């Protein structure tokens, strides 16, 4: 691409710089072509991260980190895609929260008892809770997603409430659980 030039590589990444006047659609077109060529030549689909615009060479490290964060988020989504960090602000916030001790404590306070129970007894309560929160407490959709009979789901929900002390009929509790699960996904990457 005439407005893109290669600036370096690491074992699992490469870097491109674009001129300031290039449109996002042109960057996307160029990245899709790179993705296609890598697949054609090496048989591998890659996730590409694109940082925000920088105005000084002093910002290269920050831009590199933002692009790497975009890649991490893209991989977490389970897709091999082109990820612009500017389109991933909420996920970026979760990624950053996962680094903070206060959020680690928040996650532990919310889920530690359940995680320990699942590990000790081989129960699927954490996954059940995650799915219930993703479906905003809708029991029918949760049961269908987990391929469970509604009575089995009702039993699991009662046990989860007993173990956590949480009221899973409360929308605020489900919101909190959903938030914690999103942060937890990025914490697990850091172990």
Q: What do the predicted segments below correspond to?
A:
Residues 1-191:
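Cytosolic nucleotide-utilizing catalytic cores of signal-transduction proteins
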